[in-house]
Amino acid sequence: MRKLSEVKGEEALDVLAEILEPIVEIAEDEEVRAGFDTNVAKCVAIALKKYKKQILEIFASINGKSVKETSEEIDLLSLPSYIVDVLSEPAVRRLFT
């Protein structure tokens, strides 16, 4: 999976346009926000349960793939590293704090 910081130039604008809405939708959830500062694992678990579609949209856009392709590629072992990569981005972290 590509990191957000690896997306450059005009493609960065396209990816940002695609991921902004699902990220904001997740970030506006008070339950998710409340857990972000104290228990990131709990926060991620809540987001995974409530926002599956949005999470797949984010991963797909970052990687330049369809949601279908992304959902077929993600498995139990790769999902945690995808989540860590996205949450490690300072800009994404600021949305939740």
What is the role of each PLM region?
Residues M1-L48, K53, A60-T97:
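Charged interaction scaffolds used for protein-protein
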